[in-house]
Amino acid sequence: MNKSEPGAASRRPLSTPLPGVVETHLMLGQIHLDQGRMDDAFLMFEAAARSGDPRAVNMLGRAHERGWGTARNPAIAALYYTHAADSGYGWALFNLADLYLAGQGVRADPCRAHVLYVAAARAGVAKALNMLGIMAEQRMVQAARPANAPVFFHAAAMAGDCWGSVNLARLHLAAGQTAQAMPWLRHALDHGFGDVPAAIATLVATRTEPCLRALAREATRRMAAACR
C-alpha cells in the first residue's frame, strides 16, 4: 500500500504477517511518532500495512486521519479502517465509528457509529464503552437510553478508560454525590493524559467543597507542567 493507492486496503485480502516484522515496524513507527518524526512514522506504518495485518492497516488509517507524514484525508482513513474492521479489530471499529459520528470522510451516520462502538466494546476497547455512554446520555440514536449512560460510564471506568471516570464523576457531581465522585476524579487525574486535567479543572471550577478545590489546584498544576 502506498500514497498513490488509497483504495488498496479495500482490495487486498488480509494475509499472515511475517513473525516479528509487523511488530518491529509498528514499534518504530510509534517511536518516530512520539519524537515528532511524522514522515518516518508514516513510512513505518505503510511498510507494516503491506502485510495486511489489521493493527498496521488501522495505524495507516490513523496516519491519514491525523495527517501524520501525509496529507490529512479522513476519506482514505475510512477505507483503511473499514478494511481492518472487517477482521473484527477493535481499534479499527472504534476509529471508524468516530468518523461516522463526526461525519468526517464519510456521511454522518450516528446509527452506524453506534453499531460500530458496540462491536468495538465487545472487542475489548474500553473507550467505546465511554462513547456508548455519551450516545445514551444525549439520546443520539433511538436505541440509546439516557438511563443507561451511568452503566456505560462505569463499565468504561472499570476497564481503565479515564474519560469514563470523568463522565461518571460528572454524573455523581450533578446528583450532589461528591463523595462518590471523588474516587473517579482521582483515578482520572492519576491515570489520564492529554486533555483530562483540563476537563477535570473545568468540571470542578465552580465547586466550593475543599476536596474539589484541592483537586482543581492539582489539575491546574498538571496542566501547567504539561506546557513546559
PLM features per residue range, with description:
Residues 1-31, 35-36:
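N-terminal leader/linker segments that initiate helical-solenoid repeat arrays
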Residues 2-14, 192-228:
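Terminal, low-structured helical/coil segments at or just beyond the last alpha-helical repeat
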Residues 5-8, 34-44, 71-80, 107-116, ...:
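Structural signature of tandem alpha-helical TPR/SEL1-like repeats
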Residues 14, 47-48, 82-84, 118-120, ...:
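Canonical positions in the second alpha-helix
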Residues 20-21, 51-53, 66-68, 87-90, ...:
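Short helix-capping/linker turns of helical repeat alpha-solenoids
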Residues 24, 56, 92, 128, ...:
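TPR alpha-solenoid repeat register
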Residues 25-32, 57-66, 95-102, 131-138, ...:
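Hydrophobic face of amphipathic alpha-helices that form TPR/SEL1-like repeat modules
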Residues 47-59:
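Short, charge-rich amphipathic alpha-helical segments embedded
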